[in-house]
Amino acid sequence: MKIVFFSFCILQSYFSFCQSTTSFNAPVDTVVYAKQLDDSISLQIITPSIMQYSSGVSYPVIFLFDKQNEINYQYNLETIDYLTSLSAMPPCIIVGVAFENSTRNKWTTPNISGGKADDLISFLFEDISLLLKTKFPVANFTTLIGHSRTAIFSSYAQSKTYPLVNAVVASSTANFDFGDENTKKQFEFFINEIEKSRGQYFLTFSSGTSFQLDYHEASVDSFANYLNDLQIPGKLTIMHVKEPVDHFVIPGLTVNRALANIFASYRKAAIYSLEVIQGQQQNDSVPWRQYLSLYEEQSAYYGFKIVPDLLFYNSIASSYANDYDDVFKDKSSVLALEVLLKCVESYPFDYSTYLWVSEIYFEQKKYTTAIEFAEKGIAVLTDDKVITADEKLEINDEINDFMESIHQEMKK
């Protein structure tokens, strides 16, 4: 009963999750006047769906440039959703920024070179950042994702705003060979100061090839050669992506790899937690101190608080419940229950956790409590915005059958 029913719920959640970009709430479009630019900018604010169901968690910010290029923009959103769904990166607040063709070049060129990039930086990192902090729990970690002109801007903004921009994904960039001495000096200032900072920094840049009509290859190669001659600080991770593709294809090949690389350590805590349980000898308690210390270590690395996610709770609870090495014996379900109850506290929106808790109480013959958690699971399922109505009906039928089994046992 337990394996069949719980597996059904997990599969339902998984397949529903894969149908659309489900890690995020519906986007909110707005137009904001930027006094620094004496112009208006179209923004799209997208928040992670998990935000409304958890507490004590802050979320990194991603500025995703070139919303006006809908194909690349949507692809990048789906890439972020994909990695978030797999817990390969933390849930983030996304700010999509659109540029008019008439202003894109000027706004991405430094003021000292006749542009307004410094004014755009002021708008984004003073006005918009303040707005986000007043409305959402924002973590001290910011990523910029740009292509071509906005990639140039992203790279410049990282060195100009130090220490505000932690990561840059710059696809098919030009002028990385520093077209002017001022930009070069700004970057070298960033390089020299970065070791004093808290947390880690990342710079990813890429190009296609001239043969494939990406004419930024030479400038990107020049920048890569320049970096090879520098003493790169340990706090700065550099990634150079080069593929035999054109100017418009390279962003799709860059963003996925860059984000996976930037947040590679984010997933380590969950993975190392499985090693803890595999080496666990005591069968009377959950070693929370060991688990949490892994998350504290990754938090120190990135410079913002990272907490156990659903992947952690489900993986650890499954390991206890299944007791693969026969270590926990009759305590296995007790330990699994402790983990799941902690999960319910942290993520009260996940209906399947309530149902799993209900099944454990059922096995322990605590029928009233089992019914209580099953009913809570139904209530959460009813409010779920992702699972379709037909799927909810099917899952509800399974839950009702399960609850009928509980009532039958209570009559014996």
Which ranges hold each PLM region?
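Bacterial Sec-dependent N-terminal signal peptides
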Residues: 1-24
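Non-catalytic cap/lid and distal C-terminal segments of serine-dependent acyl enzymes
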Residues: 19-411
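In a subset of proteins, long, contiguous C-terminal domains/tails are tracked
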Residues: 1, 5-8, 404-412
